[in-house]
């Protein structure tokens, strides 16, 4: 084996030289130069400094402006809430571990960090599934003129958290475990060992099928059908030009959110699959460190995409930041809502094709 397995950890370095030390007790400077750990800590500080205000402001603006409290926006608020929890409860632990180059908080801290990182990623993924299904049902109309109500949105939110807990919870109760990965400063499920006490293999298979492959299939199927429907409607002029543009704008926003998720998480998933299918193979510590830390950037993608592409939300945010005034001359947000082609919530509650 080209790595060293210990109690609650696996270091991708053979201990023939006697250098390997527990990542819960000693700095891991034998794995990488000290400056590399500092780079990771500064990167985590950036994500915390950006993620807290972006997601916090998203929640605050939504609760402050009644016009934003529409069914489809519930799912987007759910994303922001999950990101904020992950930043506060997970990223802060990762930052501290990176600064000291080992998990100061021990196996419990590792489990906490791994749990919240998994929760954040899974809530984001299943929220995108809910949005994809909503887009498919409302635009493709397999159920007729469907109205996406508050009840549907709340059920969707409950579903995202149930599925996220179904993925992040088992390692806390003995089905697999969370262990340090890469440079031993962030934690994730155990893809590395075949420890029979934790049944890692069955958990990893379950996770990749139920919590990655299935949602990806649903998302791609929904948007594949959606794109065909939008093109068909445009060709036949079934809807007004305003409605068609609204459909395209809202759909573009959600598709960009999906692409942002894939950009952040696909490298990590691909690396984890390779490690899982090539247990014992040699790989450098940076091989898992880079995708593991890069995946955490997803916590700041969605608020940025939402602000850039949702005119109503953007106006409300500017008004909130500027204490009730919009210096860009678009102060009458309520009137702009009725005219905006990119506004998500009003489109989502209509009985026409856009959500």
UniProtKB/Swiss-Prot annotation:
This protein's GO CC annotations: membrane
In the bilayer, the protein is annotated as: Multi-pass membrane protein
Give the transmembrane ranges. 37-61, 74-98, 114-133, 153-176, 203-230, 253-276, 285-309
Read off the Gene3D superfamilies from this record: Rhodopsin 7-helix transmembrane proteins (1.20.1070.10)
Per the record, residues carrying N6-(retinylidene)lysine are 296
Q: Which residues lie on this side of the membrane: Extracellular?
A: 1-36, 99-113, 177-202, 277-284
Q: Does the keyword Membrane apply?
A: yes
One GO molecular-function entry = photoreceptor activity
Glycosylated residues in this chain: 2, 15, 200
Tissue specificity, in the record's words, reads: In this lizard the color pigments are found in the rod-shaped photoreceptor cells which have been derived from ancestral cone-like photoreceptors.
Q: Where is the composition biased (Low complexity)?
A: 334-355
Annotated keywords: Chromophore, Disulfide bond, G-protein coupled receptor, Glycoprotein, Membrane, Phosphoprotein, Photoreceptor protein, Receptor, Retinal protein, Sensory transduction, Transducer, Transmembrane, Transmembrane helix, Vision
What InterPro entries is this protein classified in? GPCR_opsins, GPCR_Rhodpsn, GPCR_Rhodpsn_7TM, Opsin, Retinal_BS, Rhodopsin, Rhodopsin_N
Its annotated compartments are:
Membrane
Tell me the GO BP annotations in alphabetical order. Answer: phototransduction; visual perception
Presence of the UniProt keyword Transferase in the record = no
Disulfide bridge map: 110-187
The segments annotated as topological domain Cytoplasmic are: 62-73, 134-152, 231-252, 310-355
Q: Where is this region: Disordered?
A: 333-355
Give the top-rank taxon of the lineage listed in the UniProt record for this protein.
Eukaryota
Post-translationally, this protein is described as follows, namely: Phosphorylated on some or all of the serine and threonine residues present in the C-terminal region.
Q: Which family does it belong to?
A: Belongs to the G-protein coupled receptor 1 family. Opsin subfamily.
Give the function comment from the record: Visual pigments are the light-absorbing molecules that mediate vision. They consist of an apoprotein, opsin, covalently linked to cis-retinal.
* Protein name per UniProt: Blue-sensitive opsin P467
């Amino acid at each position: 084996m080209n790595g060293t397995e210990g109690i609650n950890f696996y270091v991708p370095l053979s201990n023939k030289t006697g250098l390997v030390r527990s990542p819960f007790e000693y700095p891991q400077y034998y794995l990488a130069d000290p400056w590399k750990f500092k780079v990771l800590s500064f990167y985590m500080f950036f994500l915390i400094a950006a993620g807290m205000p972006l997601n916090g402001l998203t929640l605050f603006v939504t609760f402050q402006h009644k016009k934003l409290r529409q069914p489809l926006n519930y799912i987007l608020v759910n994303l922001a809430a999950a990101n904020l929890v992950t930043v506060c409860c997970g990223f802060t632990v990762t930052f501290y571990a990176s600064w000291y180059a080992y998990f100061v908080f021990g196996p419990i801290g590792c489990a906490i960090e791994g749990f919240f990182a998994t929760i954040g990623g899974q809530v984001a993924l299943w929220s995108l599934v809910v949005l994809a299904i909503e887009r498919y049902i409302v635009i493709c109309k397999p159920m007729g003129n469907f109205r996406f109500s508050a009840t549907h949105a709340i059920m969707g939110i409950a579903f995202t958290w149930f599925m996220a807990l179904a993925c992040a919870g088992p390692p806390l109760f003995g089905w697999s475990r969370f262990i340090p990965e890469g440079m031993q400063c962030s934690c994730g499920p155990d893809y590395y060992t075949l420890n029979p006490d934790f049944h890692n293999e069955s958990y990893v298979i379950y996770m990749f099928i139920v919590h990655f492959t299935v949602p990806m299939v649903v998302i791609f199927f929904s948007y594949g059908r959606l794109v065909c429907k939008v093109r068909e409607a445009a060709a036949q002029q079934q809807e007004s030009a305003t409605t068609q543009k609204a459909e395209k704008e809202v759909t573009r926003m959600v598709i960009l959110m999906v692409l942002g998720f894939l950009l952040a998480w696909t490298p990590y998933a691909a690396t984890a699959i390779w490690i899982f299918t090539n247990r014992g193979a040699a790989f450098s510590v940076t091989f898992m460190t880079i995708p593991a830390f890069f995946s955490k950037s997803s916590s700041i993608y969605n608020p940025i995409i939402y602000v850039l592409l949702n005119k109503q939300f953007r106006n409300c945010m500017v008004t909130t930041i500027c204490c009730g005034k919009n210096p860009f001359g678009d102060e009458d947000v309520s009137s702009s809502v009725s005219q905006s082609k990119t506004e998500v919530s009003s489109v989502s509650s209509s009985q026409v094709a856009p959500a």
